[in-house]
Amino acid sequence: MTTTLGARDAEAAIAGGTLLSAGGSGKARAPKDRAFAEKAFSLGPVQLAPIDALPSDADLLIATAVGAPGGGKHLANPDHSIRAAKNLVAASGVSPGAVIPGHVPGIYAWLLAAALKVPLLDAACNGRGHPTVKMGSLGLSSRPQFTLFQCGVGDQVQITVQGNTLVTSALMRAAAVQNGGLVMAARGPLKAGLVREAGALGAIGYQLGLGRALLDAGASPASQIEAALRFTRGRVLAQGVVVVNAVGYREGFDLGSVHVRDEATGEEVALGVCNEFMTASRDGVRLATFPDLIAAMDQRTGEVLAISEMPPGTPAVIFAVSKRDLPMGSGIYDPAVYPDVEQALGVELARYALDPQA
């Protein structure tokens, strides 16, 4: 069943998607996403359709951005997003039948669906934020013979590349660095059948459901936090105050760590960061590892906190959601997507991420 999305849905998508961005987005992101949604609605209806609405051989386009959400200096631009999509259509010669986001919040995909006059599918490459294109590649990082287009647009650069996922993703990351940290991007075309087999099906519906739960929870911080925990089946890792935020921008990523001291125990939980929260540890013991969702909420306001919004002294609740309770694409379980992030962070990820029992 196809649903026409409106302003109330956009608010739910922003609320739910901000939490699912795992520290990549916070309250400062909401006005930007709202502007993308308003631009989308000005261009035409945004229609959410199930994956089964398209035949398996239909071509899809993925809407995303490449870069560092906190440290990058270049800001998201709706016109750049549309241009990236149109450049991809021109380069590939394919007319897409629908659009999906690389990951939530994914409001860029709403814009491209409206601009291209095609549906937004209830699917994503991942139903949570991830730091690299490869992690949203639907398993194609281990298939070097598979080629696709990636297009990026920024104030200082436009790039169109064709090749396998590993090569084109490296070039897109380099373009983002040259543009000050971020480019608006599109990639594809991919067949609907591949997304049906390997995508995070129902990701938009999950995002909207979480957002509606937050919007309906009431204004008190405690009710916001409780609604998030209840909907996601999350578990609290620490409730206290930020004591360290040592995250900085390097080579296209926000990298470093955030430490939160629990007010009840005095123990610190260390959060490893590569654009998003990737690990949580206490006394050297791993508590959660990407693709588990690790999120932060402000105890004073109940708002979701971005990593860049957590200076020392910030009162925060840190919680984790099991990867088994989230809509995930198969790219998350591809060993080829972890080495560069492990190297950047200096910690193991794949051993935990690929263990179904972890």
Curated annotation (Swiss-Prot):
Annotated protein name in UniProt: S-methyl thiohydantoin desulfurase
EC numbers on record: 3.13.-.-
Keyword vocabulary terms for this entry: Hydrolase
Function of the molecule: Desulfurase involved in the catabolism of S-methyl ergothioneine. Catalyzes the hydrolysis of S-methyl-thiohydantoin-5-propanoate into hydantoin-5-propanoate and methanethiol, the third step in S-methyl ergothioneine degradation.
Top-tier EC class: hydrolase
Organism phylogeny: Bacteria, Pseudomonadati, Pseudomonadota, Betaproteobacteria, Burkholderiales
Keyword rRNA-binding: no
Stretches that traverse the bilayer: none
Residues in the signal sequence: none
Keyword Transport attributed: no
Residue pairs linked by disulfide bridges in the UniProt entry: none
Catalyzed chemical reaction(s): S-methyl-thiohydantoin-5-propanoate + H2O = hydantoin-5-propanoate + methanethiol
GO molecular function: hydrolase activity
InterPro entries registered for this protein in UniProt: S-Me-THD-like_C, S-Me-THD_C_sf, S-Me-THD_N, S-Me-THD_N_sf
